[in-house]
Amino acid sequence: MLSNPFHDLYLSEAISEDALVEIFSPIIVELAGAVFESGNVIVRGLQGTGKTMLLNLLRPESRIAYRKAKVKFPIPKEQAKFIGGGVNLRKCGALEFAQHLQTDSDERQVKELELLFADFINYWIVSDILATILKFSETADELLCSEVGISLDPERLKAFAEAFSTDDCWFGVHPRANSVQELQASLASRIGWYRRFLNLNIDALPDEILGSKTVIGDPILKVAEALKSSGVISDSTKVFVRIDQYEQLTTLNVAGTQYGDACQQLIHKAIGARDGRVSYRIGTRSHGWPARPTIYRTTDTLELKRDFSFLDMDELFRRRENVRTWNFPDFARDIFARRLRAAAFHSENSIRKNLLAEALKDTPKPQERVARYVSQSSGMDIIRREISGLENVDAGWKNYIQRLAEDDLLSAWLACAWVRQKSAGSRRKSGGLTILPPEDGRPWKPYWYKERIPLALMQLASANRQALAWSGEDEVLNLSGGQILVFLFLLQHIWDAWLRDNRGSTVEALKFPIPSEVQSQGVIEASQEWKAKQIEGPNARQRRVFVDAVGRHLYRRLINDKAMSYPGANGFSLRVDDLESDQRLVSFLCQAVGYGDLYEAPHTSKNPGEIRKKYYLAPILSPVFRIPSVHTKEPEYINIGQANRWLLGEEQQGASDSATAEDGVQGKLFGDDA
């Protein structure tokens, strides 16, 4: 039976450490060096940008798996001297504390639950750090332990266990331990009580636990200190503490409380200790980290660069104007090859330099796309209709466009747009049509033509009632928007379409490249499903209404722009001053960006001194809305009135909201030098 190597989108979170060695891409390490240096780092990004994959490298199981596989550990040796422990808040059970919240819970009860959360996290992380020591010790690999800076001396391990088990951070609750295993068992017993409590198997925790709650972060600092003072780890060995799925804590704001916010503030308190003994690594979605990270039960906040720094996975792989600085393609190509190798798909070919290009081929050239959208005879009919609609244009220009269409339908369509722009010269100082170009020449400058190709292809396909085609390596990478999850999601659907197209075949019969029409079908299905699953997070329904309204508006705006005056109108731009006057809209747009519905960037306005922000729909939504995914020229200038109408699902823009009515700028952007 044919299988899909991309069936499991979250493979790096579900497989064993041994398999992780095979599919993990070291490219991400080269770009994320800050994660392996001292200091607190917030690793944030949209779903599926590689946060958990990166944090998993800090786990001892990953380090040991690389050693067993005789594969070089991807972290440079000078940065790889560390141990650590961590917690995944979704998996450890901490989110179940909210089950004990009641609408009639008084302040004291809520506060005690907050401090119990802190104690639970302390115990879990310290237990995981001890587990790390034991895992390295059990390998009996002296060279590996030397690289990490761990001593296997039993006397040192015993001295550590004796001293740390009786440290005052525990409030005297643990007996003196003679070994790390004994101390680990004592911690596990306490965690076991918490599990029974969280699962409602007991009504209350024992008084011994209630009377010995630890201070958030304190035992974590003490375990790092004790490990070094006893010689179990070297003074130069870094101690990293991982806390993943941080954004999940806000889901605990239930029963009329802000319990989840308080739990986040407790974590902020641990980070804000400004103590170099440990370095925190917080994994969170883009929307998860608060603008003002308040410290628990204070008005104080963490300071960027002093208390923490960001590693923004979205920015790491975001496409810039200079495509040569775009890191995502190499990362995606490596992941693609590793997935195929792990699935043993044509394994003899899976080490080629660019297997993705072999599978998807180059993105079709514009002329090839035109041939797919429209036949020559149908294209001539379409151009004739366009010519007949040109007003105040002399016969010479119409004949020129007609002759152009015989050899180049795309240029003929663009010529109609160029003529429309120039024939509107009454609104321009030097308007009007110029002299006819020579038979083999074109009236426009090269950049004018290049910037309008995506819009021309969209309009030509629509004129012949054809769907836009989506295929080729560059196209798929662009639609991925720098997100590895979206990339894998697209490949999953492309592969499914390919398997359907080869029903009854053996895996050996599947040969690259995947046909363009099959790729396009898979991309469209992926886009439709991605839009349908837009149900996560707060305001999910309103975000979906907004995205639908924006998508419909942008499509109609582009289709109706026959003069192609605004080829960049597959996005929109708002004045920052206007946004600051509408905090409700700002909050909504931040949520939409945080959940990946929109992409936001600073916008250099054509108005001197004006500060704006521009927004685009996530590229993967382009196929479902039938709009180009490439961002060229200026986005549509709108005001907050239009944006608020989109919140209500209204897409029609009134004259008072248009860019030209607002500031009179966009009409000047495509002037007489075209």
Predicted feature locations:
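Short linear interaction motifs
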Residues: 21-40, 104-109, 218-225, 259-266, ...
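C-terminal leucine-rich, beta-strand-based interaction scaffolds used for sensing/assembly
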Residues: 90, 215, 375-674
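Short, well-ordered alpha-helical packing segments
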Residues: 56-59, 126, 261-272, 337, ...
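The catalytic "switch" region of P-loop NTPases
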Residues: 219-240, 248-466, 473, 516-545
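Walker A/P-loop-proximal flanking segment of P-loop NTPase domains
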Residues: 1-101, 115, 582
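A short acidic (Asp/Glu
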Residues: 54-55, 96-100, 250-256, 289-296, ...
